[in-house]
UniProtKB/Swiss-Prot annotation:
Binds directly to 23S ribosomal RNA and is necessary for the in vitro assembly process of the 50S ribosomal subunit. It is not involved in the protein synthesizing functions of that subunit. GO terms for molecular function: rRNA binding; structural constituent of ribosome. It comes from the Bacteria. GO terms for cellular component: ribonucleoprotein complex; ribosome. Pfam families: Ribosomal_L20. PANTHER family: 39S RIBOSOMAL PROTEIN L20 (PTHR10986). The keyword Ribosomal protein applies. It comes from Bacillus licheniformis (strain ATCC 14580 / DSM 13 / JCM 2505 / CCUG 7422 / NBRC 12200 / NCIMB 9375 / NCTC 10341 / NRRL NRS-1264 / Gibson 46). This is Large ribosomal subunit protein bL20. NCBIfam families: rplT_bact (TIGR01032). Belongs to the bacterial ribosomal protein bL20 family. InterPro entries: Ribosomal_bL20, RIBOSOMAL_L20_CS, Ribosomal_protein_bL20_C.
Length: 119
């Protein structure tokens, strides 16, 4: 039985890894072994940080809402509770956008929350 060498398959696999490693510094974009390690690590970082990004944005939105709420004499938690009591269903992303770009609209929402809390 003839010997089968996987030359084309190996070359294709290695070229694929080196293509993914394009732009890396030093030997990480030229040497297969080092490039493969870095591509695997990069994939792990990408996977982890796609989930981390969602947490980071939520933290940013809450920080912005809290800052704007405190200008209206409310804490973040009391503002959110007041909005829930008054039946205003607006998510944190939109509230943060209002707090940054349209402070008057945010102040109206904060007043509605205050009125509901003072009942």
């Amino acid at each position: 039985m003839p010997r089968v060498k996987g030359g084309t398959v190996t070359r294709k696999r290695r070229k694929k890894v080196l293509k993914l490693a394009k732009g890396y510094f030093g030997s990480k974009h030229t040497l297969y072994k080092v490039a493969n390690q870095q591509v695997m690590k990069s994939g792990n970082y990408a996977f982890r940080d796609r989930r981390q990004k969602k947490r980071d944005f939520r933290k940013l939105w809450i920080t912005r809402i809290n800052a704007a709420a405190r200008m209206n004499g409310l804490s973040y938690s009391r503002l959110m509770h007041g909005l829930k009591l008054s039946g205003i269903e607006v998510n944190r992303k939109m509230l943060a956008d209002l707090a940054v770009n349209d402070l008057n609209a945010f102040n109206q929402l904060a007043d509605a929350a205050k009125a509901q809390l003072n009942k």
